[in-house]
């Protein structure tokens, strides 16, 4: 379609009076690229993203191209600057001067030159108000009217429109016309300067397209605001895509409702107001006659007839148009017969456009939502256009507002469409301006304007064409226009398809961001508002972002909104990314649920650890699943795990009966599981280590858990990322750790006994009960902290201690830093400190006892290796019994944690601590549990505060640990080995809980497998 459009432009330019200005381009893109006017934007810049300078040039070419047409041949034949001056003068003065036939001839010549001039002038317009106004007037009235009367009428219309808009455009135009000669060169030079300058800067070009359908929805003045941005800094020439976007938008809004009789014609009055840089260039292109002729493209005569009809329709449409637009078009029409001529041009174009629409109508019927969006945009555009009508720039301001809004809505979707629509607006403006000439002239002028719009740069340098050339151009333009109509249909179809595909792509692309989708989905409204606000801020700044950017893509779900004002695609992407980041998975209920389900899945897989038999529970799906399925299953498991993990905790600890929130504290590991299950909402915090990792991300919003949140952070938005092998089921990950803990347990002679006594699986037993030996590990044992500690800061130091888990800890640290930020770090730290201090005191006592027992056991091991084994068995029994007695009331993991439970107790305490922050209700349980859980392990990896608390608690719990270690004293040496292994196990277990599936999987790879 683009190729056809380019070809059409070529034929129109080459075959038309501007053929010499047309550059023979192999491809549409090349032609657009190489066309002086359109080349810049078409190549590098998206069709929609056209530099305002080029866009202004195009717009000016659209409107001032009419001025060029208006300019007398003598003036038009003048140098581009002279022509521009003359055009301005002629626009202001000459179009009054020019005779009806002259404007056509002049229209072509002046169209060429004035395209150049207007290219320059748009900048000049921006630079000089008089030039701007004059240029505007030239574009609206001087343009295709080419005739003095038509120009006068056009000017009168413009003046009326300006008066209606409160802008003395014609007065300024008269002044500009007077100053046009001096200003012409000045504007030309200035405009050239501005043109280059504006190429550098982004200029806002807004098109207000008031589309009214004769009959039926003609009562619906549809205001389309198309804002084209040349964000590339290239000459923002309106591309076929722009026009297509505009046409398609119009078609989208009215095409569905407009039904053209089988062989009849339907007139759609499209009023295009092109306001470059807030300068009101009002070209009312009424009655884009949507003439449906058996031939796909109506003949120029038919088109001209339709143009005449469009002239009438334009009046009708003017009535139908929004007040400002209608007033403008009425002023345009009332000011001169040129108004009718303008309508005719619009009608002719609209006929052709409508045929494309009719061709596309079935497709357009597919875009009901788009038409609704169009309607919304049209309403907004109406408001904007009415405001613009009130603005000095008149319809230009109207175009600026409405177009900006509409284009923002449609820019992403309708970039192509808008480019095409922009061209069509130019053509429509040209038609409107040329309407005063003759239907043919209007048609030709419309085509010329279009041609000039695209080839304005090329044609700007081209000398004025003879009238014969213009006539040939007129004929060829008609043919080309028919081609263009056909191509426009294709463009519209393509634009519609592109928009549809863009929507689909948006939906798909949005769905591509799986990890952040939840956060985005949860925050999609926030993100949309955020995007819309910056986009609204950038409405006039940049509407270039691809359709994707326009429709907020959250959670990979396309939010079908009328395109919010589109920032540049990158800006929107950045905004979306930022918003997604701001609303990371943890913030999103979807990701939270997914993470919670993942954490619960890992927890249920951890149930292998938590279960007495260490066997996966029914609801645990250890099998790797797709992230979505895994998340869904995890979500299911969250509900089930929320109940089952508390059940496990309840089974394992009297504290298990805690409410899901209170359950999270009980067992370190289980409490994390309970956290995750108990805190499905706070799942971030309530989830076990992955839950904590998730909770970190989520609790960052909750800001409850400092260190375990680091773990929870994994469960949170990052939990998949946090885990070295996030895709590996948490079960496998946990199993990976379980073998590690089991290995530690096995390395600890009492590990199995503790495991059995704990009722935990070998991993959990090794971690928690085996944690007894881990508890034996002196509180300073950094491996415990290093391995499991979610503490982001301490874990860096501790991370060096355990190499195997260092990486995981680094992730934990990263998460934990977030956790510190996001969770109630102080709450968790304090709770975990209190709980862990108590538990650490117990641990320290136990650990001291255990250490003493280790030494004593070392002696005893020498003396009583059998006793050590017995004590190891007893230690699982006794510490487990102690921990069950002490910790099970708070949490089963604590109760089941013998001295090994301490190693995991810290981890559990961390998990609980993070869960505690997530679940302040659980602090008592966590209080009791961490006291034992922390006692279990010297790991001070909860948070920095929690780490300190753990250190204190480990010291405090040293007595208990020593007591338990006294029980384990016989196996003290082995438990010292277990201290390393069990400490590693507890650290591993804690670390696993912190990053449940991630670290479990990691450990699975390392140890389990």
From Swiss-Prot:
Q: Where is the composition biased (Low complexity)?
A: 152-166, 526-535, 570-580, 624-638, 653-662, 858-875
- State one molecular function term (GO): zinc ion binding
Q: List, as start-end ranges, the regions of compositional bias called Basic and acidic residues.
A: 370-387
Q: Which UniProt keywords apply?
A: Cell membrane, Cytoplasm, Developmental protein, Membrane, Metal-binding, Nucleus, Wnt signaling pathway
Cellular location(s): Cell membrane; Cytoplasm; Nucleus
Principal localisation: membrane
Cellular component, GO annotation: cytoplasm; nucleus; plasma membrane
Where in the sequence does UniProt note compositional bias of the Polar residues kind? 68-83, 121-130, 515-525
Q: Where is the composition biased (Basic residues)?
A: 349-359, 403-414, 843-857
Q: Where is this region: Disordered?
A: 68-166, 328-433, 456-479, 515-580, 619-662, 773-799, 835-899, 955-982
Q: Where is this region: Required for nuclear localization and inhibition of Wnt signaling?
A: 584-613
Annotated region Interaction with dsh: the residues are: 206-282
GO BP terms, alphabetized? negative regulation of canonical Wnt signaling pathway; neuroblast fate specification; Wnt signaling pathway
> What residue stretches are annotated with the EF-hand domain?
217-253
PANTHER family, alphabetically?
PROTEIN NAKED CUTICLE
How the protein assembles, per its UniProt entry? Interacts with dsh.
Q: Which family does it belong to?
A: Belongs to the NKD family.
Protein name stated in the entry: Protein naked cuticle
Gene that encodes the chain: nkd
């Amino acid at each position: 379609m683009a190729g056809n459009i380019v070809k059409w432009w070529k034929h129109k330019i080459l075959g038309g009076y501007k053929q010499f200005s047309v550059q023979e381009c192999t491809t549409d893109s090349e032609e657009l690229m190489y066309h002086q006017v359109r080349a810049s934007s078409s190549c590098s810049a998206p069709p929609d993203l056209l530099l305002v300078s080029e866009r202004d040039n195009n717009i000016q070419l659209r409107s001032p191209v009419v001025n060029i047409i208006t300019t007398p041949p003598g003036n038009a034949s003048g140098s581009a600057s002279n022509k521009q001056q003359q055009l301005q003068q002629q626009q202001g003065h000459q179009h009054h001067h020019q005779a009806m036939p002259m404007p056509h001839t002049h229209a072509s010549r002046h169209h060429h030159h004035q395209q150049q001039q207007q290219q320059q002038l748009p900048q000049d317009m921006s630079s000089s108000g008089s030039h701007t106004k004059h240029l505007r007037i030239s574009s609206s009235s001087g343009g295709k009217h080419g005739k003095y009367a038509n120009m006068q009428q056009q000017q009168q219309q413009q003046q009326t429109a300006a008066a209606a808009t409160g802008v003395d455009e014609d007065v300024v135009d008269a002044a500009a016309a007077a100053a046009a000669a001096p200003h012409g060169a000045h504007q030309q030079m200035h405009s050239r300067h501005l043109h280059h300058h504006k190429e550098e800067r982004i200029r806002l070009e807004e098109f207000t397209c008031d589309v009214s359908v004769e009959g039926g929805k003609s009562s619906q003045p549809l205001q389309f605001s198309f804002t084209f941005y040349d964000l590339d800094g290239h000459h923002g020439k309106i591309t076929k895509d722009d026009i297509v976007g505009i046409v398609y938008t119009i078609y989208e809004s009215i095409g569905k409702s407009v039904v053209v009789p089988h062989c009849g014609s339907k007139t759609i009055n499209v009023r295009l107001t092109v306001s470059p840089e807030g300068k009101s260039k009002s070209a009312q292109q009424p009655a884009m006659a949507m003439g449906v002729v058996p031939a796909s493209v109506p003949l120029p005569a038919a088109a001209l007839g339709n143009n005449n009809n469009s002239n009438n329709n334009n009046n009708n449409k003017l009535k139908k148009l929004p007040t400002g637009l209608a007033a403008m078009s009425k002023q345009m029409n009332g000011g001169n017969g040129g108004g009718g001529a303008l309508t005719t041009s619009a009608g002719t174009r609209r006929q052709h456009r409508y045929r494309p629409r009719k061709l596309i109508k079935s497709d357009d019927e597919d875009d009901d939502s788009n038409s609704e969006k169009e309607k919304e945009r049209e309403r907004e555009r109406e408001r904007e256009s009415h405001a613009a009508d009130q603005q000095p720039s008149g319809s230009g301001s109207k175009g600026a507002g409405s177009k900006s809004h509409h284009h923002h809505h449609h820019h992403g979707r309708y970039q192509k469409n808008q480019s095409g629509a922009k061209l069509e607006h130019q053509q429509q403006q040209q038609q409107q301006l040329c309407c005063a000439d003759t239907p043919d002239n209007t048609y030709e002028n419309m085509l010329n304007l279009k041609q000039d719009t695209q080839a304005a740069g090329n044609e700007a340098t081209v000398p004025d064409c003879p009238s014969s050339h213009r006539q040939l151009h007129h004929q060829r333009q008609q043919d080309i226009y028919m081609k263009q109509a056909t191509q426009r249909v294709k463009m519209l179809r393509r634009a519609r398809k592109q928009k549809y595909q863009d929507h689909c792509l948006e939906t798909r692309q949005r769905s591509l961001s799986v990890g952040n989708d939840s956060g985005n989905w949860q925050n999609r409204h926030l993100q949309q508002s955020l995007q819309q606000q910056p986009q609204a801020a950038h409405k006039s700044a940049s509407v270039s972002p691809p359709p994707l950017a326009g429709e907020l893509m959250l959670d990979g779900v396309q939010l079908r909104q009328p395109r919010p004002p589109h920032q540049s695609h990158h800006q929107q992407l950045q905004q979306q990314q930022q918003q997604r980041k701001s609303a990371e998975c943890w913030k999103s209920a979807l990701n939270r649920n997914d993470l919670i389900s993942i954490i619960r899945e890992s927890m249920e897989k951890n149930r292998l650890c938590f279960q007495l038999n260490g066997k996966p529970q029914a609801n645990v799906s250890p099998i790797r699943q797709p992230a979505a399925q895994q998340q869904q299953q995890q979500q299911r498991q969250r509900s089930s795990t929320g109940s089952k993990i508390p059940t496990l905790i309840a089974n394992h600890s009297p504290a298990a009966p805690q409410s899901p929130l209170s359950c999270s504290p009980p067992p370190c590991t289980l409490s994390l599981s309970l956290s995750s299950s108990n805190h499905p909402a706070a799942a971030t915090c309530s989830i076990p280590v992955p839950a904590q990792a998730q909770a970190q991300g989520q609790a960052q919003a909750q800001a409850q858990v400092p260190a375990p949140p680091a773990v929870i952070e994994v469960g949170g938005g990052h939990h998949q990322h946090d885990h070295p092998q996030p895709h590996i089921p948490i079960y496998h990950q946990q199993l990976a750790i379980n073998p590690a803990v089991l290995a530690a347990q096995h390395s600890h002679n009492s590990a199995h006994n503790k495991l059995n006594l704990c009722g935990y699986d070998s991993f959990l037993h090794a971690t928690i009960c085996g944690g007894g030996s881990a508890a034996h590990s002196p509180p300073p044992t950094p491996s415990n902290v290093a391995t499991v500690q979610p503490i982001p800061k301490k874990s860096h130091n501790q991370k060096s201690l355990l190499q195997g888990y260092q990486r995981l800890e680094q992730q934990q640290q990263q998460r934990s830093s977030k956790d510190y930020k996001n969770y109630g770090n102080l709450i968790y730290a304090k709770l975990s400190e209190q709980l862990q201090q108590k538990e650490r005191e117990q641990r320290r006592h136990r650990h001291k006892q255990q250490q003493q027992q280790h030494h004593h056991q070392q002696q005893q091991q020498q003396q009583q290796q059998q006793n050590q084994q017995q004590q190891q068995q007893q230690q699982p029994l006794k510490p487990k019994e102690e921990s069950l007695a002490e910790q099970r009331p708070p949490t089963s993991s604590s109760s089941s944690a013998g001295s090994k439970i301490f190693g995991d107790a810290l981890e559990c305490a961390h998990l609980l601590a993070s869960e505690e922050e997530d679940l302040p209700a659980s602090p008592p349980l966590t209080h009791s549990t961490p006291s034992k859980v922390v006692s279990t392990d010297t790991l001070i990896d909860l948070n920095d505060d929690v780490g300190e608390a753990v250190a204190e608690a480990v010291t405090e719990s040293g007595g208990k640990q020593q007591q338990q270690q006294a029980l384990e004293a016989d196996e003290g040496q082995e438990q010292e080995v277990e201290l390393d292994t069990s400490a590693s196990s507890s650290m591993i277990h804690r670390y696993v809980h912190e990053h449940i599936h991630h670290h479990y999987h990691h450990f699975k790879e390392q140890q389990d497998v």
